[in-house]
Amino acid sequence: MKRWRIAPSDTPLSPAVVAHVVAGVGTPHLAANFLEAMHRVLPVTFCTVFAVGASGRLETVSAASSYGDTAERTASRYIAERFDRCDPHMLWLGARALPATSQRWVGHHRGDELIDDAYRAACYGDVGIRERASVLLLQPSGQRTAVSFYRSLAQPEFGDEDFARIQSHAVLLAEAAAAHGRAIAAAQTTVEAPLALPLRMLTKREQEVITHLLSGCTAKQTAQRMALS
């Protein structure tokens, strides 16, 4: 089990990937959009997005499977049994001091590293998942978010190249997940063009991040221009 701060990346992001990620903001298909977008660069089985507020309330839950609905059913059990209270990434984020600005990490663990038997069985062993790689976000408000990608026993283990790909997309995924939480809270009902509503849910600073990424800037160049941590 390991976690590390996200270093700015020199890898340019595909505009198609960026657009597909952003298009999921404020819709019931957030994790599905994340999964489809990342499939262009990273073979994975499931994607989940979990956000827990400062009060401990689950605020965002989205899940998607490459096939079937196993991730969705597993996420329902995660909610019902409050496995966020056993989730090592959520516990780690919850134990940290609140930052002045949003902080991001990449986290990784294998199912066999989990202590809680019920959590390990329900979310890993019983559904054939070996490991999870996550983009972790801690906001000044206390909200903590994990955007996670899972590999099954039939897939190769996550390696350095996979972590590099996740890291290069981490800012995009984290900003989109944060914007989604606000969109759901606002309960917008306006129907607009495919990207108009999701983009309107982003703060001005987040819109600047997305604009830089869509223009072909790398995450590192974007961070340098905007002094992102």
Label the predicted regions.
Residues 190-229:
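Helix-turn-helix DNA-binding segment
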Residues 2-9, 13-25, 29, 33-143, ...:
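Regulatory input/activation interfaces that engage signals or partners
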Residues 69-70, 185-186, 229:
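Juxtamembrane/interface motifs at transmembrane-helix termini
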Residues 177-194:
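Short alpha-helical interdomain "coupling" segment at the junction between an upstream regulatory sensor module
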